[in-house]
From Swiss-Prot:
This is Myosin-binding protein H. GO terms for cellular component: A band; M band; myosin filament. Residues 112-124 have a biased composition (Pro residues). Belongs to the immunoglobulin superfamily. MyBP family. It holds the Pfam family I-set. Residues 26-69 have a biased composition (Basic and acidic residues). It comes from Gallus gallus (Chicken). The gene is MYBPH. Residues 1-25, 87-104 have a biased composition (Low complexity). Binds to myosin; probably involved in interaction with thick myofilaments in the A-band.
Amino acid sequence: MTGKTAPAAAKKAPAAKKAPAPASKKAPEPAPKEKPAPTPKEGHAPTPKEEHAPPPKEEHAPPPKEEHAPAPAAETPPAPEHPPDAEQPAAPAAEHAPTPTHEAAPAHEEGPPPAAPAEAPAPEPEPEKPKEEPPSVPLSLAVEEVTENSVTLTWKAPEHTGKSSLDGYVVEICKDGSTDWTAVNKEPFLSTRYKIHDLASGEKVHVRVKAISASGTSDPATLEQPVLIREITDLPRIRLPRQLRQVYVRHVGEAVNLLIPFQGKPQPQVTWTKDNQPLDTSRVNIRNTDKDTIFFIRTAQRSDSGKYQLSVRINGAEDKAILDIRVIERPGPPQNLKLVDVWGFNVALEWSPPADNGNSEIKGYTVQKSDKKSGKWFTVLERCTRTSCTISDLIIGNTYSFRVFSENACGMSETAAVAAGVAHIKKTVYQPQKIPERDMMEPPKFTQPLTDRATTRGYSTHLFCSVRGFPQPKIIWMKNKMEIREDPKYIAMIEQGVCSLEIRKPSPFDAGVYTCKAVNPLGEASVDCKLDVKMPK
């Protein structure tokens, strides 16, 4: 600190020089006394300074104006050349305030006090950061292979690694009967497979694995059973038959006899559980050999349904299989069967699914009817997948009852739901609605009149008009007010109310006024036209 404050003292020295001349002149006298002061300053600076402060105070008491010099003087003590100048201004300050004489020492030591405030913020404790959670336990620790002097382990990464990434794993072993765990690997590794070497043949060891990260170490994943160090020539493997890879269904009362082969050398240990619980030996019989296991239930009950787990283990090596066995029976009858509506020769029915489905999905419903006269039941619908239906083609005048069976994979329900009411199909006489007769009588009326025509001699021509009326009117053709009777030169026709007159090879004599007259009992009507026959050029 002495080296750092020296420049500051040098810079502030001029401020001290600006003080009155007598102060600067008398400075050399205490200088020899102050030269040894820097050495004690490093250890116990305050004591020597307080001892030398009073003599200069008495000498320079008259000039009180130098009270403003203490600040620069405080910064100058580290410099050995100018300490006298700094101490002289500090003396008057001490004279005017004898009580703060102890404060004078800090004034001389304003160089060291800055160290004290600098130390004050340092001790303030920073708020502790919340500790990060360590990784979770590694998953699915298992033995992959065992030889005469080694064990190969496999596992899966933990579900949670925390905010820090995973640094690796540590594998530890402990001899059976001991509690001392020893790390096998010196440094963490990231692989989820590890082979432990140099193990004694015939020895049993416990194995566990820990996950490590910057936030801490996880709880260990430990094998349930110790591993016997001996060579496994053939790893355990279950050869599950194809029909057992899906739900195995049996009916209530039937026997369940399953043979499941497996392999493994030396002979593996076989374990059966049901829904992760030990088997009920009063219901299930198990017989094991070195190559297969037999699962036998003499009389199956619905309570025997569930998921059975087969485990084949050699030391830590293990293979598992799950058998899903379902024992079913006939379902119960449908519920709440009722007649919803009866109209014409139709009936609408509704019901609810059975309370007991027999441990199997309901495939459909069978609906039957019975007429009051015969009393026999006849099936009208099979495998109806809905809980409602409409029955048609019932005989008018009969009274019908209805019942419904439910059906699953085991068969139809033993009993049926019978509708409380009956449906009576009433006789109804159909009377067509009478249509009022319409008066179609109408006098003749031409809807299309004749038009004047011009033709050339020797070229046949036609005259057309249309008429309506009821009864159908009689048509009379006339030429120049004279009725045309049966003349081969003229051909008259009427079809769908269209009247036509053909004049064959007309001559100038055939020119004139032609009239079409329609007559019926209600009246008559007529139209005229003019025909002009020209001579060819």
